[in-house]
Amino acid sequence: MARLQKFYKEEVIKKLQSELGLKNVMEVPRLEKITINMGVGEAVNDKKIMDNAVRDLALISGQKPVVTKSKKSIAGFKIRDGWAIGCKVTLRRQQMYEFLDRLINVSLPRTRDFRGLNPKSFDGRGNYTFGVKEHIIFPEIDFEKTDAIRGMDITFTTSAKDNAQAKALLEAFGFPFRG
């Protein structure tokens, strides 16, 4: 069992149940999945860029990413229907908690000029998304071997009913929110 998963079951559930005034343990919000999305628009011209992005995302997440393809042709972006334009990976269970642990304790503190995560990035339904400008903040990525510095979006999907419950859950895990 991952360290944060054990921490959630032993401490976070009890704390949130009393803090949020919930009667049933099953009402306590939980983290359902983490989705990491990397848009690679430059891959339209060079397929090697997509291969490198997939390799980097696999190293970061510990799981093979799915290549996302464009749904329709857009002349302004010079893309055609079905072309590879990004990659994503969905983490659940053990791998999700291990990634979360590395993200909070190792990667986010390595970010340049990091002042905390924006507390307004909740979607209204208990999910939280933030962007990472440089994927080299993850210790799995060797700066010397990367061809380019890429950004990515990380989405935390929770079972929380609203933003307040989701924020309480993420703060209990130790998310460094601003303010």
Swiss-Prot record:
Keywords: Ribonucleoprotein, Ribosomal protein, RNA-binding, rRNA-binding, tRNA-binding
A Gene Ontology term for the protein's cellular component: ribosome
GO biological process, one term: translation
GO MF entry, a single one: structural constituent of ribosome
Record NCBIfam families: PRK00010.1 (NF000585)
Summary of the function given for this chain in its UniProt record: This is one of the proteins that bind and probably mediate the attachment of the 5S RNA into the large ribosomal subunit, where it forms part of the central protuberance. In the 70S ribosome it contacts protein S13 of the 30S subunit (bridge B1b), connecting the 2 subunits; this bridge is implicated in subunit movement. Contacts the P site tRNA; the 5S rRNA and some of its associated proteins might help stabilize positioning of ribosome-bound tRNAs.
PANTHER family, per the entry: 60S RIBOSOMAL PROTEIN L11-RELATED
HAMAP family for the chain: Ribosomal_uL5_B
Oligomer status and interactors: Part of the 50S ribosomal subunit; part of the 5S rRNA/L5/L18/L25 subcomplex. Contacts the 5S rRNA and the P site tRNA. Forms a bridge to the 30S subunit in the 70S ribosome.
Family membership: Belongs to the universal ribosomal protein uL5 family.
Name this protein carries in UniProt: Large ribosomal subunit protein uL5
Lineage of origin: Bacteria, Pseudomonadati, Pseudomonadota, Gammaproteobacteria, Cardiobacteriales
